[in-house]
Amino acid sequence: MKNKQSNTTEKGMAYDRMLCTGLNDAAKQIHEDAKRKGFWDSERETGTLLMLCVSELSEAVEADRKGRYADLKAYNECEKADDIFESDKEVYELSSFQSLIKDTFEDELADTVIRILDLCCARGTDLEKHINLKLKYNRSRERMHGKAY
């Protein structure tokens, strides 16, 4: 059944409000960090940046194929550890990240989003606005958007 465009979803919730907020602020911070690390010392082509996003998604696929998933429970326990000398804490946290989070499915998805947000800030794209517009439009479309998959 095709939804008629209105200000409510099938469940009656209003969707004319911003559903996606904070991404533009995150994009600014990510882009500033990337500039500080030298990733923007020279202008970068949009196509290259988009392919870097694709490569991160490919790494997420590979992590999934290998069954590599983040163990946040163990990582959070490591963060709570109070028997670590303050001078060793940074090394301990880095080691915990590398063994429990790095190169996992979730880590690669995070890398993908970071690259997308960096690109959006660099190109002046208001991603929050575009996501909200797309969500609103998609709610007006038929089931599965009229496609098999």
Name what the model sees in each region.
Residues 1-149:
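Flexible "arm" and connector segments at domain edges
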